[in-house]
Design a protein with these regions (language model features):
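Short acidic, glycine/proline-rich loop/turn micro-motifs
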Residues: 176-179, 218-219
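C-terminal substrate-binding subdomain of Rossmann-fold SDR/epimerase-dehydratase oxidoreductases
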Residues: 191-193, 199-333
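N-terminal Rossmann-like NAD(P)+-binding domain of SDR-like oxidoreductases, especially those catalyzing
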Residues: 1-174
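Residue-level signature of the cytosolic catalytic core of signaling kinases
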Residues: 50, 54, 183-187, 255, ...
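Short capping/connector residues at structural and topological boundaries
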Residues: 46, 84, 88, 125-126, ...
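Short-chain dehydrogenase/reductase
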Residues: 90, 138-146, 180, 184-192, ...
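Oxidoreductase cofactor-interface core, primarily capturing Rossmann-like NAD(P)-dependent enzymes
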Residues: 161, 177, 205-207
């Protein structure tokens, strides 16, 4: 199959592009490079440098490349920033997705795999969280993803566009050979920041709040390796190609770690090297952060046969460390 990957030059997108190629598919990437890196793409993968807000450019990409399916990653992704810049988030994530859906509806009505998020669930009352838990996002970012899921379903009802919406929990890690990895323009993710702090690029790690109702007072998240997530996309695209109906699946490991436990795991990974343990400082809560997000992923395991290979947090962090240690300035190195 030929797959159009929006946001394919980004962190998860570039790992998924490799996984799709590895599964024998061909790929075209559409990305405005606002936070992605052309260097993250394997040689020979066509890159359409375009913005989803440019409806005509999106339509043209679909007409020229005639893909069989779309995997839609392109979005702004920061929970905290979405609270202070809501307009940017609604415009980029909701209007951008609307443009893509409109273009699909006007051309080939191909199926779509969408990057959704655990942030849909907000302050979840059950843990691990099943897909039918109430959707009550605590951030604008989460709202933009919920709105996009709703638009996708409306476009299915009106135009027959099938979808698999993958609700990722916290994505981390890198290909074990350290050749590509996480290099977000604004660094906000816990593990990326901790490893850059270990490399001496930041003085200390801030812990955003220790008064949450969790075992040590810091937020709990479910950390999933980017390669396991990439494999979920391959399975989803292939299922849709074989005629699968639309669904939404959580993608996570099913157990969560507190912020302090993650920082301990980072210290354990760097222990014995020339790098000092992390200096930690308590800071106020970050707006929009729910206390705990842990996935019930049994549905994707049963329906698509997905099975995560990276189940040990230190092992996952080790792969990210390999990338950051060998590329301390990301794709600039
Ligand atoms: N990283 C996580 O932990 C996580 C968790 C849940 C969901 N997600 C979702 O996964 C997707 C990918 O996240 P990521 O961590 O790889 O982020 P990323 O910033 O590395 O990738 C996003 C890509 O989309 C591109 N992009 C953004 N807006 C665009 C637009 N208007 N037009 C064209 N291209 C545009 C960027 O240049 C970038 O290459 C996002 O949709 C995000 O919401 C990420
Ligand atoms: O320097 C830091 C950075 C983060 N945190 C905390 O660590 C946890 C994880 O934060 P982060 O790595 O920024 O991820 P999330 O805010 O949980 O969001 C990620 O995970 C979501 C799914 O759960 C995705 O939807 C988002 O796109 C993605 O950014 C949160 O409790 C943060 O408050 C700190 O304490 N200090």
């Amino acid at each position: 199959m030929k797959i159009l990957v929006t946001g394919g030059a980004g962190y998860i997108g570039s790992h998924t592009v490799r996984a799709l190629l590895g599964a024998g598919h061909s790929v075209v990437v559409l990305d405005n490079l606002s936070s992605g890196h052309a260097q993250a793409l394997p040689e020979g993968v066509p890159l359409v440098k375009a913005d989803l807000l440019d409806q005509a450019a999106v339509q043209e990409a679909l007409s020229v490349h005639q893909p069989d399916a779309v995997v839609h990653f392109a979005a702004l992704i920061e929970v905290g920033e979405s609270m202070s810049q809501p307009g940017r988030y609604y415009r980029n994530n909701v209007v951008g997705s609307l443009n893509l859906l409109t273009a699909i509806a006007q051309t080939r009505k191909i199926p779509i795999v969408f990057s959704s998020t655990a942030a849909l669930y907000g302050d979840a009352e059950v843990s691990p969280i099943p897909e039918d838990a109430p959707k009550q996002p605590t951030s604008v970012y989460g709202e933009t993803k919920l709105m996009t899921e709703q638009m996708i379903q409306a476009f299915e009802r009106a135009h027959g566009i099938r979808s698999i919406r993958l609700r990722y929990f916290n994505v981390c890690g890198a290909v074990p050979d350290g050749s590509i990895g996480e290099d977000h323009v604004n660094k906000t993710h816990l593990i990326e920041l901790a490893l850059l702090t270990a490399l001496g690029q930041r003085e200390k790690m801030m812990i955003y709040g220790d008064d949450y109702p969790t075992r040590d007072g810091t937020c709990i998240r479910d950390y999933i390796h980017v390669l396991d997530l990439a494999q979920a996309h391959v399975l989803a695209v292939e299922a849709l190609a074989q005629g699968a109906g639309s669904s939404a699946y959580n993608v996570g490991l099913g157990h969560g770690f507190t912020v302090r436990e993650v920082l301990d795991a980072v210290d354990a990974v760097i222990e014995g090297s020339d790098y000092a343990p992390l200096t930690r400082e308590l800071a106020p809560r970050r707006a929009g952060d729910p206390p705990s997000l842990v996935a019930d992923s049994s549905s994707i395991q049963q329906s698509l046969g997905w099975k995560p290979e990276y189940v040990d947090l230190q092992g996952i962090i080790q792969t990210a460390w390999e990338w950051h240690r060998t590329h301390p300035h990301g794709f600039q190195d």
